[in-house]
């Protein structure tokens, strides 16, 4: 949808990257090392000083004793981290449980690993989606009652059923892209109990670990009893330090798993960029005040954007973490969310992602916006979205004429 946004000159709230700069200390360090390096390969699983700084940071936030030599592989973004982790623990013919909605790469990673995905619905507070779950052939067991549901939730029985069917691992995106769910400690314990019972693994995607809105708290499932041995934690520096283009990610896991991840990683990309690791090491050493400021900054952006949507009478998911909202466009008679997003970019001037990209179920009434933008960018987008209701009348007429 970035291409569509560029085509029509729309404000791009589709692809999840910020339009503000990384912390100056990081970019200053990059400028310092540009003349003299490092410019050649680092150790394939990550430069020593980078891994040491990362181990110290993550040990601080998780309370775990993470060894920089035994428990870390540095990857080219969390995308590679997830692929390497999947190929490490999953064999051809295995199955992998994935919550729906989901970041689209998870399905591809599963298939490329020779495994089969099993989808577990996260049920949001919309009756339209509840009905979609009920009639989806792939979600016959996921039917939900017609009562209102307070937040995204899951049926633990469906997780257990997935492992009964042979799931080797479960993918956990927490906080969740696209729905913004932050899993509670109790929910994570429920997942952990099932995974332990069936001798499985959890592969996490925790790239938004520091973007969580009060009163919610991020809990690392690897810290629960019995889960360090069964968790392959994937994350990156992209969102935390606003360096999505630097492609610096990592895997944290027990030594017996990391030894195998190293081998897979070596044949996927060899190693992450040495000068970028050197520069980013500065960020890994930031004090707690940086992460508190980051959370405050994102809370401000969330309030600015969501308050604007509320003023227009629009219905959307209220994120607990990450930086996405899913807008309910069912009142405009939307049957094809891709077509609607193309229309939105052309006629309203704001880019969004069709919600159906993230769902296994038959869901076409949601579109995803992200709000990791400067105030002036968000305000300009809101100014354009203020005309959505009036302009949508032409869209509705178009849809009627198509019928």
For each feature predicted by the language model, list its residue ranges:
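PLP-dependent class I/II
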Residues: 1, 5-9, 15-33, 64-403
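A ubiquitous short alpha-helical element
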Residues: 39-42, 263-264
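Conserved N-terminal alpha-helix of the aminotransferase class I/II PLP-enzyme fold
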Residues: 41-76
């Amino acid at each position: 949808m970035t291409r569509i946004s560029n085509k029509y000159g729309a404000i791009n709230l589709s692809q999840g990257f910020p339009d503000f700069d990384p912390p100056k200390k990081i970019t200053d360090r990059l400028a310092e090392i540009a003349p003299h390096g490092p410019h050649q390969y680092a150790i394939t699983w990550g430069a020593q000083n980078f891994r040491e700084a990362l181990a110290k940071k993550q040990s601080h936030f998780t309370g775990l004793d993470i060894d920089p030599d035994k428990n870390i592989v540095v990857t080219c973004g969390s995308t590679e981290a997830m692929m390497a982790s999947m190929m490490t623990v999953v064999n051809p013919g295995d199955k992998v449980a994935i919550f729906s909605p989901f970041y689209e790469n998870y399905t591809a990673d599963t298939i490329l690993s020779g495994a089969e995905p099993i989808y577990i619905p996260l049920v949001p507070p919309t009756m339209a989606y509840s009905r979609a779950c009920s009639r989806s052939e792939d979600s016959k067991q996921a039917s939900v009652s017609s009562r209102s549901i307070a937040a995204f939730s899951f049926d633990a029985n469906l997780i257990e059923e997935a492992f009964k069917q042979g799931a080797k691992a479960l993918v956990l995106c927490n906080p969740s892209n696209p729905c913004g769910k932050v899993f509670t400690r109790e929910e994570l314990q429920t997942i952990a109990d099932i995974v332990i019972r069936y001798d499985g693994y959890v592969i996490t995607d925790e790239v938004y670990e520091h973007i969580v809105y009060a009163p919610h708290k991020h809990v690392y499932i690897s810290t629960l009893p019995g889960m360090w041995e069964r968790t392959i934690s994937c994350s990156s520096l992209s969102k935390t330090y606003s360096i999505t283009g630097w492609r610096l990610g990592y895997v944290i896991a027990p030594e017996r798993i990391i030894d195998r991840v190293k081998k897979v990683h070596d044949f996927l990309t060899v190693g992450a960029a040495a000068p970028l690791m050197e520069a980013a090491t500065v960020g890994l050493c930031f004090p707690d005040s940086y992460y508190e400021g980051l959370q405050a900054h994102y809370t401000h952006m969330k309030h600015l954007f969501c308050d604007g949507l509320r003023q227009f009478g629009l219905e959307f998911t209220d994120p607990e973490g990450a930086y996405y909202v899913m807008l309910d466009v069912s009142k405009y008679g939307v049957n094809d969310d891709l077509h609607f997003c193309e229309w939105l970019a052309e006629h309203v001037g704001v880019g969004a992602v069709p919600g159906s990209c993230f769902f296994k179920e038959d869901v076409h009434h949601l579109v995803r916006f992200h709000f990791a933008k400067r105030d002036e960018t968000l305000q300009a987008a809101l100014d354009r979205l203020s005309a959505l209701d009036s302009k949508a009348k032409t869209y509705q007429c178009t849809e009627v004429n198509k019928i």
